[in-house]
Amino acid sequence: MAPRIPLPGVEDMNDAQKVVYDKIVSGPRGTLVGPLRAALHNPLLADCWQALGQVLRYETSLPPHLNELAILVAARHWNSELEWTIHAGAA
């Protein structure tokens, strides 16, 4: 099944997209997955989104394993299979 929004490959990114991509993969995430990848079509949106996500996931007062557990609790509550899949390994 083809994605609804074509996902940009690294080799096809323009300069602005590449800057945001490099920020994401060189940071604590280490990889680019999920809807943030589609957001790269708008580099400003993707950059703001990744910055907010980084603060919410990596810069809280909770220890990392409890932060991941909180994400899983929210994912389960909202039946978010994507969030569960992304975060289950880290919890």
Regions picked out by a protein language model, each given a short descriptive name:
Residues 1-62:
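Acidic, glycine/proline-rich low-complexity segments that act as flexible tails and inter-domain linkers
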Residues 48, 62, 66-69, 74-91:
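Conserved alpha-helical segments that form or flank metal/cofactor-binding pockets of metalloenzymes
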